[in-house]
Amino acid sequence: MEKLARKQVQALTPYLSARRIGGSGDVWLNANESPFDNEYNVNFTRLNRYSECQPPELINAYAAYAKVTAEQVLTSRGADEGIELLIRAFCEPNEDAILYCPPTYGMYSISAETIGVETKTIPLTSEWQLDLPSIERNLDNVKLVFVCSPNNPTGNVINRKDILSLLEMTKDRAIVVMDEAYIDFCMEVSTVDLLATYPNLAILRTLSKAFALAGLRCGFTLANKELIDVLSKVIAPYPVPVPVADIATQALSEAGLARMKYQMLDLSANRAYLHAGLMVLNGVTVHEGWGNYLLVQFSDGDAVFKAAWDHGIILRNSPIKDCVRISVGNREECEKTLGFIRNQLM
């Protein structure tokens, strides 16, 4: 069967999500999930009917939250589908390319490789910022430039002046895609205000992180109407199931937003607790981050990751040497993780 697959697919290494990697334990801090399991009222009386392609109540609710117009919003099955839609809509297979800046989210390259679109990589600088001169030298045939901010796994925010420079250098050449999956934790640095100035800007959002709805698979692409109209040509006819739209709309209601903001305060306190406890340990460097996770460097990160794994504390190893990414869980999970690491390093 393998030989019947397309050559690009035969050569493809699938994205190793936290769930694919697996593990066995009672502390799961490897997927940047929220520890809050919120309840929703779900209407199961309309499941014999197809959902609307873009449910108006959901679109209007997210537009209000994001402070954009409804025509600037497209909802999809997670932000991952938004990545795929952008590549399918704007990149010619075996002709065009995307560009991204590692270390960063791995689905940009996999989504491109799946359909035969070249990937160009320009590593982030030593301070995990954009290497603008190198990006500019490598823009030939590039249709999409993916920038994650706050970046996963490093946690830092990309300098706004560099984003502006990137938008300027790609005018009439390429679309800059800002992946803002973690922006709810630092909305003040969102690039959403730049949509008014730059038609070559697209923004990816999700309900998986701050809204505690990773299992719902609901994401959004924000852009100007002309770009949204192009994406609408390639999206599936019924991308958002009825229960998903119902739950997401509830999460974006006044009560839902109040709960989300309260829970973010709790997560912020837990992140500060974890950060303070780790940074005083010998041989440990905690990198400043803005999301619901911390990138932590040890003298031997692989050893810490494996020891925690064997102890039932599931963290995420990192492509960055000796670094482990730790999601911020509830206080009990953070205490257990910190206590284990402290004992491990003694």
Swiss-Prot record:
Homodimer. Belongs to the class-II pyridoxal-phosphate-dependent aminotransferase family. Histidinol-phosphate aminotransferase subfamily. The keyword Transferase applies. Pfam families: Aminotran_1_2 (PF00155). Its cofactor is pyridoxal 5'-phosphate. InterPro entries: Aminotrans_II_pyridoxalP_BS (IPR001917), Aminotransferase_I/II_large (IPR004839), HisP_aminotrans (IPR005861), PyrdxlP-dep_Trfase (IPR015424), PyrdxlP-dep_Trfase_major (IPR015421), PyrdxlP-dep_Trfase_small (IPR015422). This is Histidinol-phosphate aminotransferase. Keywords: Amino-acid biosynthesis, Aminotransferase, Histidine biosynthesis, Pyridoxal phosphate, Transferase. Pathway: Amino-acid biosynthesis; L-histidine biosynthesis; L-histidine from 5-phospho-alpha-D-ribose 1-diphosphate: step 7/9. It comes from the Bacteria. GO terms for biological process: L-histidine biosynthetic process. HAMAP family: HisC_aminotrans_2. One of its GO terms (molecular function) is histidinol-phosphate transaminase activity. Coiled coil: none annotated. The modification N6-(pyridoxal phosphate)lysine is found at K209. NCBIfam families: hisC (TIGR01141). It catalyses: L-histidinol phosphate + 2-oxoglutarate = 3-(imidazol-4-yl)-2-oxopropyl phosphate + L-glutamate. Signal peptide: none annotated. CDD domains: AAT_like. It is an enzyme of class 2 (transferase). Its EC number is 2.6.1.9.
